[in-house]
Amino acid sequence: MSQSIYVQGGAGLLHARQYGAIRTAQVPLIVMHGVTGHAGLWHHVATALSQNRAVIALDMRGHGLSDWCAQQDYATPAHVQDLACLLEALGQPQYDLAGLSWGGLVSLQYAACYPERVRRLAVLDVEPSFTQSEHEVMARPANFPSRAAVMEYERKANPQAPQSLLQLFAYESVNQVDLNLWQRRHDPYFLRRWPFRNDDVWAQLEELRCPTLLLHGERSFVRLAIMQEMHDRLRHPAGLYELPDTGHLLPLEAPEPVAAYLEEFLTAD
């Protein structure tokens, strides 16, 4: 089970799902999704990991139940500021971070900026820099005639996802605005622009002081060779692991292996 929490971010209210209670003896884990995603992506992983710690899954600004930014300030540093707001509100001295795709870039940059606040970091399926511009966005439908159509779309994109998790993810990805009209639950801005394409975090990657785990999906468009180079440049590498027959959305298509890798990493000596 999870409960919704809201905190004030840099441009409005931020929504997050908290799984499990914060315990004095256990560092909380913060998990973050990627562009056009939402906190529900992590539901199965967070449920599994919350047996031993609190897990908080954040809806990034402009996504899920978090407020949209009126100024459309969606650059990665703005999300780092939001993450700082969430962690300050939670009031713990240290955190573990795990982020998929854009969430991985946000988590990495936070860890580089606030090394004393991050105990361990996991970065899932992302490259540190990009050749594409922020306007080169993969086409995707903005609207659907039914939730069944959303499910059909997400099943094609994520063929290995467990049915129950895929349904949760798909249904929470849209809002019903008319009898036969469902719209994506994120700012339409992200159908046109992906501002993280301006990021280059190689230098920050090399500055990380915490143990860092990397996970890659075998079917992902993210290049394994680039993630291997990331691993080679880390000060404190904790391994690079590829999940077989898994696409870009690792927590959605392979929640059990992701949870297992994270549990082992977070409890290592």
Sequence positions of predicted segments:
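Flexible "cap/lid" loop of the alpha/beta hydrolase fold
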Residues: 108-112, 119-148
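Gly/Ala-rich beta-loop-alpha elbow adjacent to hydrolase catalytic centers
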Residues: 99, 103, 107
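Alpha/beta-hydrolase fold catalytic core
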Residues: 1-29, 51-53, 93, 239, ...
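Conserved serine/cysteine hydrolase catalytic core
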Residues: 178-233, 242
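Serine-hydrolase catalytic-loop signature spanning alpha/beta hydrolases and amidase-signature enzymes
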Residues: 34-44, 55
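Conserved alpha/beta-hydrolase catalytic His-Asp/Glu region
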Residues: 141, 145-199, 204
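Catalytic histidine-centered segment of alpha/beta-hydrolase-like enzymes
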Residues: 246-255
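Active-site loop/oxyanion-hole signature of alpha/beta-hydrolase fold enzymes
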Residues: 10, 17, 23, 44-47, ...
